[in-house]
C-alpha cells in the first residue's frame, strides 16, 4: 500500500527538502552519508531507482498520479517500503517548489558514496573528463552525449556542477545514473597518473 499524504501545510518540515533547502545544502558535505538529491520526472526517477538509489520521499501532482502511466509505474515501486508520497494540485506544487515540475513528479533519494577514480579506471578504455563545467544543463547534456557514444566513465574536476543536481540529471535524461562517474582533485593529478593508469588509452577533455 502506498503512503500517500496530501499537502495541507507548506511549513511541514518534511517538505523542506523540496521547498526550503538548496541543492548544495542537500549534499551535506559535513556528513556525506546523509547527503540527498532531487530527481525530476518519472523517467529520471526510474533510472535512479534502477541504479540502486534509495528513495526518501516523493512529490507528485495529483493529475499525473491518476493519468500518467509512467508515473503510476514508478509509484508501484514504492509499494510496501513506506516512502511518503506528498501530493497536491499543480498550482499548489508550483507555489511550493517555485517551478513547474516536469511530468509532475519529484523524488528525494539518498546519495551513494563516490568511487575512487583509480579504482574506477580499471577495465575502462573510453573516459570523459569535464574540467570546470559549472552549468548543470551542460553537464547533463555531456552525460547524455557520453551515453550515446558508449563512454565507460566520466571524471569531473571540483569546479564542475554536480551531476546529481536536479537540472543536470533531468537534462541527461537519467544517464547520470547509467555511466560511472566521480570527482577528481584536478586535471594535473590525472595527467601525472596517465602513463601508469592508461598507457594506451585516450582521455577526452570537454570544456564549456
Task: Put a short name on every predicted segment.
Residues 1-73, 160-161:
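Boundary-proximal intrinsically disordered activation/regulatory segments immediately upstream
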Residues 50, 77-80, 86-87, 91, ...:
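RNA substrate-binding interface of SAM-dependent RNA methyltransferases
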Residues 53, 100-102, 123:
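Short connector loops at helix/strand junctions that flank enzyme active sites
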Residues 54, 103, 175-177:
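A generic structural signal for short beta-strands and their flanking turns/coil linkers
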Amino acid at each position: 500500500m502506498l503512503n500517500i499524504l496530501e499537502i495541507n501545510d507548506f511549513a511541514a518540515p518534511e517538505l523542506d527538502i523540496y521547498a526550503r533547502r538548496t541543492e548544495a545544502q542537500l549534499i551535506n558535505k559535513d556528513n556525506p552519508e546523509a547527503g540527498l538529491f532531487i530527481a525530476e520526472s518519472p523517467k529520471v526517477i526510474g533510472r535512479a531507482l534502477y541504479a540502486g538509489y534509495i528513495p526518501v520521499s516523493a512529490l507528485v501532482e495529483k493529475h499525473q498520479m491518476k493519468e500518467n502511466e509512467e508515473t503510476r509505474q514508478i509509484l508501484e515501486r514504492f509499494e510496501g517500503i513506506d516512502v511518503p508520497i506528498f501530493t497536491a494540485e499543480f498550482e499548489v506544487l508550483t507555489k511550493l517548489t517555485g517551478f513547474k515540475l516536469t511530468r509532475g513528479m519529484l523524488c528525494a533519494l539518498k546519495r551513494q558514496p563516490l568511487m575512487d577514480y583509480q579504482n574506477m579506471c580499471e577495465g575502462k578504455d573510453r573516459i570523459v573528463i569535464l574540467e570546470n563545467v559549472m552549468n548543470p544543463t551542460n553537464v547533463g547534456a555531456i552525460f547524455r552525449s557520453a551515453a550515446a557514444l558508449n563512454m565507460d566513465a566520466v571524471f569531473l574536476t571540483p569546479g564542475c556542477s554536480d551531476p546529481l543536481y536536479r537540472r543536470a540529471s533531468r537534462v541527461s535524461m537519467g544517464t547520470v545514473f547509467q555511466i560511472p562517474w566521480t570527482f577528481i582533485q584536478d586535471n594535473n593529478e590525472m595527467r601525472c597518473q596517465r602513463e601508469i593508469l592508461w598507457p594506451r588509452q585516450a582521455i577526452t577533455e570537454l570544456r564549456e
